[in-house]
């Protein structure tokens, strides 16, 4: 194809072009169906594809559906608003569209027909152009368009039109062969450099995943250069001689090596390639690579888990789950076939140590993967054994748990050195095809240094000859895994047949006799201990990582002691000098290692006692052992040997205070069976009953507590009766056992804890007591009784005596953080009972602090104490004293208030207060001065008004007296009452005079008499009125 013109991205370009128009004009960026010249600018922008549907809301916008290719004409460089102007190549329309609805199609290399044909063909019926042009990813701008998923291209809606010619819906054979020929030519031209699929290896990983996972629609086109590793696809069809040695890569993975039997070791990329190879869509298959699903995780996936991988279609999830089940079945079938093949192989294979092979692995997919042990490749080269490394199909294989030892007939000769020998018992076990076909996988064989079987354990050989290279390898190689009854029968076989079987040796034969070195027996898993078929047989069990050095195991719950002879001790030291095991602290909670020879004693004990668990070469730690955190001390071999001679058991940190007498508390008389004819360093095996006695005698009791207890018991015996002394001794003994059975909690600095019960007389205790007196106290038992005691209070220490003649305190109560409350409604029965028995009518109680309180730690037992007294004054006195004592204010800690309003410091507040006081004083002085001025002004006004009022009053009085005299004179001279009443009424009318008022009767003479004159004006008015009425009166009298 020529590069001078633009190649179409999809077949849906410009379908409205007439037949006489050249196709090159249609595909040219200079051509625009609408005559717009803006199309010439579109060549500078990348191609976009619509990922969401958008309907235009205005005329100048552009409709697009998912999968539409958008040719950008103008971006938003001018406005920066996210709206681009482009052309939809499907509808050939131009307009504005939101760029967030589209995705950029990246460009990495000029298009090649080989790469274009490797993508999925999409042929559209919208054009009758050449199908080759319609099915390729095109143009310089979008040649290697890496789409997240190829589905949106297929879902692009089509525009219906009337076809001008017959539509070719299927690719013709001629075009297909032409495509193949062109691809071969381009392959020869590009053979110098790597294919373009590897160009994006260093680029965006998200884009490269889809780019590399697209399945070729034409077989044999996705090929690599000749120097890359040869691969082949499951659907490879060889085209010609040049492609016979070339294969199709899927996701960059060689599909020929994707064997479902090896699915456990697949990487996420290989899983993706496998499902693409099986015909699943790229989107679903790529989910395994996206979520990093390795082979081990794949085999553990269930149907519900596939939904978490964003595989939305249920049908696809179900088909993938069925494919996973097929892979599992292939693995199981291959494991059984390998076991059958090992049975029919030649005889010399049994003299070689086989590598791990595939077995029944269904259980391993359900659990977590154990940490990989040190492999054979990591062994030091100076051990005279260099194993052949196992050929792996990938150097960077994922870590996995090595399989148990089985005998693979196909890989044995190629991988194992012929001089490595195994014992005869392995040959017998190898013949049993059902040995490892069990619901559980056999335990992982640990490699050197093995934490489960230390090299220093004297399990090699009794001889003192230096070990041979085969013996060295037997210590370093993965040990043999025995399961179920085979393990037991193997040990029983040699314990019964070989009379020279040493108690500390697991080798049935020496080097000279048997000629085969036996690897040390591994510690099987914890739950594979029980042998239900034969109870009397010896079973070996232990946790994998819990076998300590010989002689250094902590005591189990039954306190079994391991025994050893002097010959075994010398051999043990020699073995430790030969092999040096690095120390490890994670395997510190080990189990007891008992001797195999003690099995006979255990069998003898069965006839006399109830059968117990037998000793074994690798005895497991008992479940009832509560000291799992005891750590084993690691030291040099010399110190270990010396400490081994001194004692046969290891003291844990919690038993450091035990003495030799405590350790030897169980005498031979108590345990007649446990003694053994051994050297002085051998210890007896103690049975359960005696071990309990010895443990109870070896409890952690401090000297101070023991002394206090002894003194208390002696004094109680002296001060009380015989029955009380016996009773008290029993109770004290019980409290001592409780104290020693569990460590006593740490006491704070309370006076009760510091001093304890004092030997002091009552009189001396009363001298410095805060309060003292007789009270009745309720007992603590179920049938509690009230007893009268003499109490003395010293701080928070409330002690009491049984009588005033006692020289030692009878009891003690620590009332720290207690509350003192009177007896309420719920305590009426207690109060009533105390009153009825004559112990006191007034009852109150002491309540201990709430559980969980930080101040709730007291020396005495926290419980409610009831007290009763005879009168109210005594109760108030005791309650007041107790309340004052229990008030606990810690002045060393600042008080934090819940008031959230911001405040100022104390010094600032004091300064502000002083200023405020000064301002207040000034303000008060000003107010006083102003008040004095106001008071003076008001006083002057009042005085002036008073004077005026007095003057007016005096004038009014004089006026009234004068008018009274005149009236009396007129009464004497005039006999008519109307005239006098008229004169009086006129006077009371404030100067208003009218004959009509008198005539109408509105004014009466009494008004003038009762009214007083107001002011000096009325005097003048009165005279005028008198003159007026005087003439009138004279005139009327004359008439009458």
Swiss-Prot record:
Residue numbers bearing the Phosphoserine modification: 18, 24, 28, 450, 519, 523, 546, 652
Keyword field contains Methyltransferase: no
Ranges for domain PH: 768-887
SMART domains for this protein: PH (SM00233), SAM (SM00454), SH3 (SM00326)
Domain SH3: 43-107
Any Gene Ontology biological process: retrograde transport, endosome to Golgi
Region (Disordered): 1-39, 365-412, 437-478, 491-744, 943-986, 1007-1040
Highest taxon listed in the record's lineage: Eukaryota
UniProt biased composition (Basic residues): 690-701
UniProt biased composition (Polar residues): 8-17, 372-397, 459-478, 573-598, 654-684, 973-986
Sequence ranges of Basic and acidic residues compositional bias: 557-570, 600-609, 702-732, 1015-1024
Protein keywords: Cell cycle, Cell division, Exocytosis, Phosphoprotein, SH3 domain
Compositional bias ranges of the Pro residues kind: 444-457
Subunit relationships: Interacts with BEM1. Interacts with TOS7.
Additional information: Present with 688 molecules/cell in log phase SD medium.
Protein name per the record: BEM1-interacting protein 2
Organism in which the protein naturally occurs: Saccharomyces cerevisiae (strain ATCC 204508 / S288c)
